[in-house]
Design a protein with these regions (language model features):
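Short amphipathic alpha-helical interface segments
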Residues: 1-43, 47, 54, 62, ...
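Short alpha-helical interface elements
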Residues: 33, 37-38, 51, 70-78
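Short, amphipathic alpha-helical interaction segments positioned at domain boundaries
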Residues: 67-113
Length: 113
């Protein structure tokens, strides 16, 4: 059973119920909702995304823009969400490979398949 979500975690999970969410978009959403006033908002969001990936509550998808993203698992998924450049549109990291997340209650890929 998962612990109750913080407002930041809940925002990330709720947004992920809608569609594949680009990492830069969730940072903008968190800022607009005033869920973090930290100057290190990107680091804060990245830490929560990483924890949710490790907990199996969200999954990561990635691919070059504008191609359809593909499911990414394991160490690659974790390394992508730890790259703070992925949280800004048109950064070098984002231009190489745009990273998305989705709430597993919306879309779940069996990692063993």
């Amino acid at each position: 059973m998962n612990a109750p979500a913080t407002p930041l975690e809940q925002c990330i999970l709720d947004e992920g119920l809608e569609d594949l969410i680009p990492l830069p978009e969730i940072v903008q959403t968190v800022e607009m909702r005033g869920l973090s006033e930290s100057p290190s908002i990107v680091s804060e969001v990245a830490a929560v995304i990483g924890a949710l990936v490790r907990d199996g509550r969200i999954q990561i998808w990635a691919g070059p823009w504008p191609a359809e993203p593909e499911f990414v698992a394991g160490p690659l998924a974790e390394s992508l969400v730890e790259d703070l450049g992925q949280y800004q549109f048109n950064s070098p990291s984002d231009l190489r490979r745009r990273v998305y997340y989705v709430n597993v209650d919306n879309l779940h890929v069996d990692e063993r398949a």
